[in-house]
């Protein structure tokens, strides 16, 4: 299941990386490729994501739903 979320003021898609199944935040706008911890992960120019395993506990706590409600990303990782 994919979910649109807010992280660092940007709307990203909380999903699983297609190649490994790892939870990640996928870009929704090409301008997001410059965000800290964003990685190029594919053969297409728009395949960038931030792997949740690379975020600190503080950064994980900053991921919210589109209405600003905090998300328990640790719990959500199993549902994505």
Mark where each language-model region is.
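Short intrinsically disordered terminal tails
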Residues: 1-2, 73-80
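Residue-level detector of beta-strand face positions
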Residues: 2-4, 26
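Acidic, low-complexity, intrinsically disordered interaction modules
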Residues: 15-66
């Amino acid at each position: 299941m994919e979910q649109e979320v807010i992280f660092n003021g940007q709307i990203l898609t909380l999903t699983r990386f297609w190649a490994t199944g790892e939870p990640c935040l996928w870009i929704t706008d090409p301008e997001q490729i410059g965000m800290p911890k964003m990685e190029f992960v594919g053969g297409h120019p728009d395949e960038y994501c931030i792997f949740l395993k690379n975020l600190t506990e503080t950064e994980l706590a900053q991921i919210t739903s589109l209405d600003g409600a905090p998300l328990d990303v640790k719990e959500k990782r199993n549902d994505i």
